[in-house]
């Protein structure tokens, strides 16, 4: 895995893939949830100092986001009706509360499962998803399921790095994550996992070495875009 010194990461919460209540949600809804729960800026002062007006704390120290539908459709490169539909799915599953604000963008309160709000000092289990997989045009057409699968593969690979004990005959570090595991976490047909892996291989994010028991997986971080212009996120079909 390449040096992650210049990488920034978004948090993709694990309960979206392990709790049966949320597993059937659309992959794009889960990625939208990751965007609106981004918590790099936890105070109004920090947000203002860094010219980031998307994250705030209310009078009860609850985190909320301010994103217009136009902002969100630009980030995910989908239509405004799609954003409205994705938000509706999050609301119906108890993961989002939207408070209307007169003459301003609505407040978006991302929620943890079972009616818990996010607070400033929360620590959560999550998969790390590199920002550059959205920012770099090289990856703009990767499907939503492939992006979420990549986050899972990356987490498994990081565990191999931590354990420092999973090496092949060429002394290269690898991880194992079966197609059945991915299919179960993403709530998809097992046959689709092969397509996902092929897409990640084609993009240079994954290398696969067939093995009798389970494929050996080698995960690479995405290339960081050196273009200073803000790129739109594109989530493929």
Residue ranges and their predicted role:
Residues 1-67, 105, 112-177:
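Short recognition helix of helix-turn-helix/winged-helix DNA-binding domains
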Residues 33-34, 190, 233:
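Hydrophobic transmembrane signal anchors and adjacent membrane-proximal interface regions, especially
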Residues 41-108, 159-223:
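Winged helix-turn-helix DNA-binding recognition segment
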Residues 118, 198, 202, 223-237:
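Charged low-complexity intrinsically disordered patches
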């Amino acid at each position: 895995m390449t040096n992650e010194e210049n990488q920034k990461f978004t948090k993709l919460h694990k309960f979206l893939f392990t709790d049966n209540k949320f597993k059937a949600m659309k992959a794009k809804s889960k990625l939208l949830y990751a965007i609106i729960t981004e918590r790099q800026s936890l105070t109004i002062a920090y947000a203002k100092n860094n010219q980031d007006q998307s994250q705030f704390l209310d009078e009860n120290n609850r985190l909320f986001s301010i994103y217009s539908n136009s902002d969100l459709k630009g980030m995910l490169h989908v239509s405004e009706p799609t954003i409205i539909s994705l938000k509706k799915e999050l609301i119906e599953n108890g993961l989002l509360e939207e408070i209307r604000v007169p003459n301003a963008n609505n407040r978006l309160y991302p929620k943890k499962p079972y009616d818990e709000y996010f607070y400033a000092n929360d620590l959560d289990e999550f998969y790390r998803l590199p920002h550059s997989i959205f920012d770099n045009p090289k990856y703009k057409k990767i499907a939503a399921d492939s992006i979420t699968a990549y986050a899972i593969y990356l987490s498994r690979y990081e565990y191999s790095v931590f354990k420092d004990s999973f090496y092949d005959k060429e002394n290269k570090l690898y991880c194992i994550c079966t197609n059945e595991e991915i299919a179960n976490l993403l709530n998809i047909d097992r046959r689709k996992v092969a397509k996902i892996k092929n897409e990640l291989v084609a993009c240079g994010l994954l290398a696969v070495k067939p093995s009798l028991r389970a494929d050996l997986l080698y995960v690479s971080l995405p290339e960081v875009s050196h273009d200073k212009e803000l790129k739109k996120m594109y989530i493929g079909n």
